[in-house]
């Protein structure tokens, strides 16, 4: 019996190894790519459309059978070719304005990808979507079922659902670009992760976020959104997007430290190797050290960022040569901006300094960090709809300086829902002179902006903010252009003793409940 068991085990191992035959199998319709990995990975690419139509990993079919995995909603048609070059296989899909690459290294159960564009797709967004078997890969990581919409009832558009009493949306899977190096879908025996180490040609900056995954029932979607119109704050960039990698494993979560420098030897359009780049090093100073500091570089062609060390020192990622705007953030709040030039093969030295400047503070609600952190419902807003029963009451609320908790102040004001927001404070005789009420916002919807009344004085109505033409707060977004509004308060308006401020939402537009004109608070400060 023992000898038969050994023989069976040995035969099973031999079959696994035998199946791991690195190479390309070509038919009239498709290329079958065998990664030659110990845990066998084979995937099939259509020669007419560039769709991935099969992903067989460790003996299980992980690709959804109804629709392929592809760029956008599929290229429709493309010139597709595949070549084997030593330890690498490259599949190239060409259209007039886009080239998609799939690259495999011998022995690795990883599909490396890159997308080269010369113009934005007509749909106004650029994404890769892997449509995967939701029975074998039902789970979404790292945020769980907040974006599992299977069996739900649509409550807003076609992308926010009510599932078992909880609001869910694919948008609730998002993570800030600066923190999103990996997101996954998984099951008991398989895990597929998107590894993202290069955002240079994406759009939106370090704090932009977009859809990462969505189990809609028929299949579980694993995405990489390179750009979109989802609260987009800058023009889309063209060129090479990536490399990005789809990593297959049986259990453990893979490292994000993946070397893709071999792309330099594979004739990939737009790829710039490390020796064709430069860096920027320096020290940031002046901002509040209780927040993380971020330095961000961008121009029309590329974007980069890094957290600083605790002492403010930083070194950029390897950057393409060129002239860049350089921004310093306290949290997500811009405190300084300058410019810098990057040259090939060198490290440019550039320090940056800045801080939040106001005046003698009478009161401050929240922090100047570019986020609504700490305000009521802010801790839930990323992962659920404002109407969710798990949210606290939106109000209208009254915040009393000196006695209220920060959670007594709403993260957002919605016209006709919870406005006006009321602030009560006590002033001394020395504080009755001219003052400034500064209202920081992070995002506006439908032209919503604040108008303040201080006691009997009505502040002027500010002009409408830039329209980003995208739902925000209801889809888990809080960051837009970060408009800051100053209300100049004449001397004598503030009185010794009790004072009342109301902040209302004004807009020429209208909408129902949480789709009414609205804005999200960053910080409210009264100073002289």
From Swiss-Prot:
Disulfide bonds listed in the record: 50-93, 184-193
UniProt keyword terms in alphabetical order: Carbohydrate metabolism, Cell wall biogenesis/degradation, Disulfide bond, Lyase, Polysaccharide degradation, Secreted, Signal
A GO cellular-component term linked to this record: extracellular region
InterPro entries per the UniProt record, alphabetical: Carb-bd-like_fold (IPR013784), Gal_mutarotase_sf_dom (IPR011013), Galactose-bd-like_sf (IPR008979), GH-type_carb-bd (IPR014718), RG-lyase_II (IPR029413), RG-lyase_III (IPR029411), Rhamnogalacturonase_B (IPR016590), RhgB_N (IPR015364)
Any one GO BP annotation for this protein: cell wall organization
Subcellular location: Secreted
Catalytic activity: Endotype eliminative cleavage of L-alpha-rhamnopyranosyl-(1->4)-alpha-D-galactopyranosyluronic acid bonds of rhamnogalacturonan I domains in ramified hairy regions of pectin leaving L-rhamnopyranose at the reducing end and 4-deoxy-4,5-unsaturated D-galactopyranosyluronic acid at the non-reducing end
Enzyme Commission numbers on file: 4.2.2.23
Molecular function in Gene Ontology: carbohydrate binding; rhamnogalacturonan endolyase activity
Alphabetical list of Pfam families matching this protein: CBM-like, fn3_3, RhgB_N
Signal peptide: 1-20
CDD domains xrefs: RGL4_C, RGL4_M, RGL4_N
Enzyme class, broadest EC rank: lyase
Gene3D superfamilies: 2.70.98.10, Carboxypeptidase-like, regulatory domain, Galactose-binding domain-like
Family: Belongs to the polysaccharide lyase 4 family.
Annotated function: Pectinolytic enzymes consist of four classes of enzymes: pectin lyase, polygalacturonase, pectin methylesterase and rhamnogalacturonase. Degrades the rhamnogalacturonan I (RG-I) backbone of pectin.
Protein name listed in UniProt: Probable rhamnogalacturonate lyase A
Taxonomic lineage of the native organism: Eukaryota, Fungi, Dikarya, Ascomycota, Pezizomycotina
Gene, per the UniProt record: rglA
